[in-house]
């Protein structure tokens, strides 16, 4: 006969053992949670920019801060759409976009105020978009052309925005649509050169419809696709950003980038710390890190982003390929994003109906 004492003892021992196991498991879980590295979600454009960030920018930040950085690839309008879809429950911590969509994000209240840091004192005044957003790189919108193709045809290099109208380029011109910032800049410049501007865009549409559209082989939004058409010889000239031009030149392709005599247009790559933000402090630190001279120089070398940090020193050959230095930055044309963003949807509808059809 089994002793009642033994039964009670066995039962107590079993319960104590189970409790000990549960406590150990819970403690282990708490330890893992306490030591799990945080994750920072950084949204930015794809292609060469994404590869540069993943290989040359992010790893050092991860190591220094004990954080896992996930790069969320998408063009600027896609990133803005994600912020709108996730309003109030943002999954993105740091958003990097072209300045136009960034101004929209600011108007919609998606960015928190940037915390003070010494690096902000080193930036060009143009780089501070607002108390909540800063440029982290700068490019110029101008014209890129295949130097070898021009030489074979005996053509002089383009010098002006009006060269886009020349009928000798019929079906040899690549053009971004106005959903792309380069294309939008082109429309505004054609309006300005014909008596209009952001507040009177009609002259720009007229020039595109009558003179530029017949020259366009394809309306190309993706930078990689435009590069491919240039490399294949399908087009010999296109509206380009100086950063994209550097990326293509780095492959050995004979692309020349020119600043039109009327002026190239400033395009800034901007960043902000998204709100609400579970990793606010890390987000602010990441933006400051990207503005450091070391990372600014990496962006210039790899992707043609001109530094917005005035203390960065570039070798002359590299500096010549981008809007580098106070004089060059001051020469860039600016656009009125407040007016553009109010009208952009209307312009896009009109563009699809009358130009890109």
Segments the model singles out, each with a brief description of its role:
Residues 206-212, 249-275, 313:
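Periplasmic-binding protein-like
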Residues 144-149, 189-193, 267-279, 298:
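A bilobed periplasmic-binding-protein/Venus flytrap-type ligand-binding module shared by bacterial periplasmic
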Residues 316-357:
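Extracellular/periplasmic bilobal clamshell ligand-binding domains
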